Amino acid sequence: MGVRDSHGEATATPDPVEKGFATLNTIRIGVKAMVQKDGELRKAEILSIRQRKDGPSFYVHYVDFNKRLDEWIDSTRIDLSHEVEWPQPEKPEKKKAGPGNKAPSKNAQKRARAGSREVSATPDLLTGKNTNIGKAQRPSKAGGKENRDETPANLSVLDSEAISADVTPKPEMEDVDMIGVSFTDTKEEHEQGKMSREEEIERLRTSGSMTQNPTEIHRVRNLNRLQMGKFDIEPWYFSPYPASFSDVDMVYIDEFCLSYFDNKRAFERHRSKCTLVHPPGNEIYRDDRISFFEVDGRRQRTWCRNLCLLSKLFLDHKTLYYDVDPFLFYCMATRDETGCHLVGYFSKEKDSAEGYNLACILTLPQYQRLGYGRLLIAFSYELSKREGKLGSPEKPLSDLGLLSYRQYWRETLVELLIEPGRESMSENELAVLTSMTEKDVHETLVVFNMLRYHKGNWVIVLTDQVVEQHNKRLEKEKIKGSRKIDPARLQWKPPVFTASSRTWNW
């Protein structure tokens, strides 16, 4: 008998977990076993198995841990003295008998014929020829976010056909490297928007992504290690580099031109010839420590694609790496006698219909927890101020991106509200002063419990906890120093683009 939830609806009883002892020969994908991790036994799921000369190796995901910890292990780390959990067998799909199996009525046949005539009479948006709805192709991502693959769920078949006809189709390589996302409105997705802050943080901790795409979660990381400049880096996620790169222990990336090599000798030969010592764009900001370069995705297509490939190693929700023409890339770099070393970047649509000021943001792992992420966010809002617009990042953000933005929003609002003479300010005034959207201002006030209902009105309140955190940050900045954007050093005017430079260029 099924179990009923709090709403009285019947829910399916979960299938019992099958357990038993296993050997190295019987372990298969989907098995959950106890694995040695940092001197402790932790439950891990086998996601992939590969055979090597020295024996099999297993790619595992540690249950209830962030997927960034997924790794290849050898058989000696699997404790077979404990029982394992066997994967559930795949159930055959049941054919449901419904109204669709019945013979259509005469009226329905007439409506179907009428609908067919209407569709066949619809001209193609590009060629002007009639479009056959039965040959509808998958819609392209034109006009979408650089790191998102989304088709509105409420589009009819005709609307999707019109969209795909209005843009240039994607290259064939996407069928191999990219994974589509289903946007059906499930109950689980609906309830995710109602999660508390604690539940949301817990989900970020264990999954590492705001997208929650189950196909991405189980995708195997394909590179072992990177050498970029003086740093050896361990990738976090899959990125569609050449398949042969997964067989080498180290991939070499030129930190200036971002070219990639699976052979050290080839990399050294390239370095002896490569003359690039900074991101290939206009330097629009320089202070004592850092510089910002504006790189046009259309003019520097190869470099920007290489940048997106590199980013995919650390952003699991990023799905595009070749459609860079409609984007500008603002790259932050530190300077020394050898050149300008890439620290991080954010991308921005040249013409965002929704008014977004950022599409994708990343601080490279070797520079994280040094305050550079906050500088990238602050710089994006400084550009919005120069444009005279309110800006907001596109969603979904990665887990680190979301936490960084919320911290920046809170600190920015508290700095304004704590100033003398600002005792009475509205959300609209805060938005104008910070170039944040009113929605972001409102959500930040709600998340940090700074919005209260008092005597029939909503008022902004600086709680003792918020003020204490602000004072601690100021004390830390006095000791360690702080990095801030100086608007006077920004040499930039909002660029103006032609119609051709804003669109996909295939």
Curated annotation (Swiss-Prot):
Biased composition (Basic and acidic residues): 83-96
Binding site for acetyl-CoA: A359, C360, I361, L362, T363, Q368, R369, L370, G371, Y372, G373, R374, S398
Domain notes: The ESA1-RPD3 motif is common to ESA1 and RPD3 and is required for ESA1 histone acetyl-transferase (HAT) activity and RPD3 histone deacetylase (HDAC) activity.
Listed Gene3D superfamilies: 2.30.30.140, 3.40.630.30, N-acetyl transferase-like, Winged helix-like DNA-binding domain superfamily/Winged helix DNA-binding domain
Record keywords, A-Z: Acetylation, Activator, Chromatin regulator, Chromosome, DNA damage, DNA repair, Nucleus, Transcription, Transcription regulation, Transferase
Xref: Pfam families: MOZ_SAS, Tudor-knot, zf-MYST
Lineage, opening ranks: Eukaryota, Fungi, Dikarya, Ascomycota, Pezizomycotina
Subunit note: Component of the NuA4 histone acetyltransferase complex.
Post-translational modification summary for this protein: Autoacetylation at Lys-318 is required for proper function.
Gene assigned in the entry: esa1
Protein's UniProt name: Histone acetyltransferase ESA1
Subcellular localization(s) per the UniProt record: Nucleus; Chromosome
